[in-house]
From Swiss-Prot:
Description of how the protein assembles with itself and partners: Monomer.
Name assigned to this protein: Arginine--tRNA ligase
Family under the similarity heading: Belongs to the class-I aminoacyl-tRNA synthetase family.
InterPro entries: aa-tRNA-synth_I_CS (IPR001412), Arg-tRNA-ligase (IPR001278), Arg-tRNA-synth_N (IPR005148), Arg-tRNA-synth_N_sf (IPR036695), ArgRS_core (IPR035684), DALR_anticod-bd (IPR008909), Rossmann-like_a/b/a_fold (IPR014729), tRNAsynth_Ia_anticodon-bd (IPR009080)
An annotated GO cellular component: cytoplasm
Residue positions of motif 'HIGH' region: 122-132
Keyword Iron: no
Entry GO MF terms: arginine-tRNA ligase activity; ATP binding
EC number: 6.1.1.19
Major location (coarse): cytoplasm
Intracellular or extracellular location(s): Cytoplasm
HAMAP family linked to this entry: Arg_tRNA_synth
GO biological process: arginyl-tRNA aminoacylation
Length: 577
C-alpha cells in the first residue's frame, strides 16, 4: 500500500475544503525525524501565499476538515504551518498483516504501460568494458522494478552493429583467411580489430577494399551479410556470458542494434525535407534547431545526411524513437546512456517532436549517469592506463570475495563457498554502483564495496541472513504464526512497521525517476531499524507468546522486504554467511 498517496489525497481534499484551489499540492513527505511524526504535509506555505493568509492559519483550517480517523493517532501543526502526521499503531498492525498475506507484500499494480528501456548497448567486435557497467546494471534495476509493478517492459539493447568498421573487419578477416569467425574468441576479434585499423590507416589499397565491402554489406550482398552476422553472433555470445554472470535479465532476444533502423533512414530524411524541417546546406541535409545555439548565437545545424550520402547517429536515433512509438507502441521510453550524450539526444528528440513522430504525451527520458572513477578521481583504468575489461573486473571481484568468505567460513564446503563468493562478489560490484545517485560520478573502491559495515552488498546480504537466523532459532509453526495477530506497542515496533509499509512508495520513486539508489537507501535504513528493534524488543524471549509471535511477524516481513527489494536491484540473497 502507498500511505503517502493515501495521505496526500486526504490532505488535498481538506485543503480544498479550506478554500485552496483544486490543483493544490499537499506536499506530503516522509518525515526526516521521529519527533515530526511519520509524515509531514508541507504544502501550506505555497497555497497560503496565493490565498493571502498565514500558513499556520491555513493549516488550522485544514485540520478542521482533515479526517484521518483510523489512520493517524495524532496530527499536529508545527513551526510556520507544517502538519505532522503520526500513524496509528492499529493501522500499522493491520497493514503489516495484509502485507504478509500477499505475495507482493501488499504492493498495488498501477495502470499498465508499455515501457521501452534502452540500456547496455555494447559494440560488436569489442569486449565489454567497465564503461558498460553502469548502463547495464542501472537499466536492469529499472526494468526489474517496472516489471514487478506490472508494466510491459521491452528491453532494447541498442548494440553498435553497423558502420564502416565492418568493411574493415571483414576485409581483414578475409585477408587472414579466417572467414570461419564463429570459432574465434572475442579476445581474438579485439586483436583483429586493432590490426585491421592499423592496416586501414596505413594501407590505402586495403582501406579502399574495406570501403567497397561496406557498400556491398549495405547493399545486402549475402556473402558480406553472412560475415557480418558471424561477427555479431560471436560478440553477443560472449556478452551473454557477462550478462549471466552479472545476474542481468538481458538475452539475445533483446538485441535491437543500429542495423535494425537502416531501412528507415532514407525515408526519414525525405520526410524531414518534405516537411520543411531539413534543408540542403553545403551539400548535406541539415535541420536547424532554434532551441540550440552555436557560438555565434545562431540556430544550431544538426546534420542528418552527409554530403556523401552517409547517415549519422542522430538519424539513427530519430528512426529509433519513431520505431519505438509506432511499432513497439511505447507509452514511455527510458534511455540509460551516459551524461556526455545528453545534448545529442536532446537534438534528436527535438527533431522527433517537430516531425510529429512521437507525441508529447509519450515521455522520452534520458536517465543519464556519471562516470566510474578510480581512487585518484580519474576515469577507472588498468595500472597500465588501459580500459578495464568487464570480465576481468568480475574475475577480481570473485577472487576477492572468495578470500573474504573463506576467512570467515574456514569449514564451509567448497561448492557452497563458491556460490557464496559469487553472490557476495558480484553483488558488491553492482550494489556499490546502484547505491550511488546515478547522476554523479563515483569512486570505485574494492575495500569499501566488500566491507561488512555501511551501505554495501555484504552488509545487506548479512542483514538478511541475520533475520532468517531468528526463524531458525524460533522453530515456528507457520500456520500458528499466520493466524497470530500483530500488536504494536513499542516505539521501535511502530518505527519498523511504518518503514516496512513504505516499500511501495520506494518502488514508485525508483520507477518514476529511475534511481535505484533510493531503494538501496531504503533497504539500508530498514536493516538499521530492524537491528535497533532486535536489540531493544526481545523476540524469542518476549514476555508472552502473543508478543513473541507479533515480533516474529515483523521480522518475517523485514526478511521478505529485504529479499524482494534486493531482487529488484538484481542482488542475490543467501541463506547463510
Amino acid at each position: 500500500m502507498n500511505i503517502q498517496a493515501l495521505l496526500s489525497e486526504k490532505v488535498r481534499q481538506a485543503m480544498i475544503a479550506a478554500g485552496a484551489p483544486a490543483d493544490c499540492e499537499p506536499q506530503v513527505r516522509q518525515s526526516a525525524k521521529v519527533q515530526f511524526g511519520d509524515y509531514q504535509a508541507n504544502g501550506m506555505m505555497a497555497v497560503a501565499k496565493k490565498l493571502g493568509m498565514a500558513p499556520r492559519q491555513l493549516a488550522e483550517q485544514v485540520l478542521t476538515h482533515l479526517d484521518l480517523n483510523g489512520i493517524a493517532s495524532k496530527v499536529e501543526i508545527a513551526g510556520p504551518g507544517f502538519i505532522n502526521i503520526f500513524l496509528d499503531p492499529a493501522f500499522l498492525a493491520e497493514h503489516v498483516q495484509q502485507a504478509l498475506a500477499s505475495d507482493r507484500l501488499g504492493v498495488a499494480t498501477p495502470e499498465k504501460q508499455t515501457i521501452v528501456v534502452d540500456y547496455s548497448a555494447p559494440n560488436v567486435a569489442k569486449e565489454m568494458h567497465v564503461g558498460h557497467l553502469r548502463s547495464t546494471i542501472i537499466g536492469d534495476a529499472a526494468v526489474r522494478t517496472l516489471e514487478f509493478l506490472g508494466h510491459k517492459v521491452i528491453r532494447a539493447n541498442h548494440v553498435g552493429d553497423w558502420g564502416t568498421q565492418f568493411g574493415m573487419l571483414i576485409a581483414w578477416l578475409e585477408k587472414q583467411q579466417q572467414e570461419n569467425a564463429g570459432e574465434m574468441e572475442l579476445a581474438d576479434l579485439e586483436g583483429f580489430y586493432r590490426d585491421a585499423k592499423k592496416h586501414y590507416d596505413e594501407d590505402e589499397e586495403f582501406a579502399e577494399r574495406a570501403r567497397n565491402y561496406v557498400v556491398k554489406l549495405q547493399s545486402g550482398d549475402e556473402y558480406f551479410r553472412e560475415m557480418w552476422r558471424k561477427l555479431v553472433d560471436i560478440t553477443m555470445t560472449q556478452n551473454q556470458i557477462t550478462y549471466d554472470r552479472l545476474n542481468v535479465t538481458l538475452t539475445r532476444d533483446d538485441v535491437m542494434g543500429e542495423s535494425l533502423y537502416n531501412p528507415m533512414l532514407p525515408g526519414i530524411v525525405a520526410d524531414l525535407k518534405a516537411k520543411g524541417l531539413a534543408v540542403e546546406s553545403e551539400g548535406a541535409s541539415v535541420v536547424f534547431l532554434d532551441e540550440f545555439k552555436n557560438k555565434e548565437g545562431e540556430p544550431m545545424g544538426v546534420i542528418i545526411q552527409k554530403k556523401d550520402g552517409g547517415y549519422l547517429y542522430t538519424t539513427t536515433d530519430i528512426a529509433c524513437a519513431k520505431y519505438r512509438y509506432e511499432t513497439l507502441h511505447a507509452d514511455r521510453v527510458l534511455y540509460y546512456i551516459d551524461s556526455r550524450q545528453h545534448q545529442h539526444l536532446m537534438q534528436a528528440w527535438a527533431i522527433v517532436r517537430k516531425a510529429g513522430y512521437v507525441p508529447e504525451s509519450v515521455p522520452l527520458e534520458h536517465h543519464m549517469f556519471g562516470m566510474m572513477l578510480g581512487k585518484d578521481g580519474k576515469p577507472f583504468k588498468t595500472r597500465a592506463g588501459g580500459t578495464v575489461k568487464l570480465a576481468d573486473l568480475l574475475d577480481e571481484a570473485l577472487e576477492r570475495a572468495r578470500r573474504l568468505v573463506a576467512e570467515k567460513n574456514p569449514d564451509m564446503p567448497a561448492d557452497e563457498l563458491e556460490k557464496l563468493a559469487n553472490a557476495v562478489g558480484i553483488g558488491a560490484v553492482k550494489y556499490a554502483d546502484l547505491s550511488k545517485n546515478r547522476t554523479t560520478d563515483y569512486i570505485f573502491d574494492w575495500d569499501n564495496m566488500l566491507a561488512f559495515e555501511g551501505n554495501t552488498a555484504p552488509y545487506m546480504q548479512y542483514a538478511y541472513t541475520r533475520v532468517l537466523s531468528v526463524f531458525r532459532k524460533a522453530e515456528i509453526n507457520e500456520e500458528q504464526l499466520a493466524a497470530a495477530p500483530v500488536i504494536i506497542r513499542e516505539d521501535r515496533e511502530a518505527q519498523l512497521a511504518a518503514r516496512l509499509l513504505q516499500f511501495e512508495e520506494t518502488l514508485t520513486v525508483v520507477a518514476r525517476e529511475g534511481t535505484p539508489h533510493v531503494m538501496c537507501a531504503y533497504l539500508y535504513d530498514l536493516a538499521g531499524l530492524f537491528s535497533g528493534f532486535y536489540e531493544h524488543c526481545p523476540i524469542l524471549s518476549a514476555e508472552s507468546e502473543e508478543v513473541r509471535n507479533s515480533r516474529l511477524k515483523l521480522a518475517q516481513l523485514t526478511a521478505k522486504t529485504l529479499k524482494l527489494g534486493l531482487d529488484t536491484l538484481g542482488i542475490e540473497t543467501v541463506e547463510r554467511m
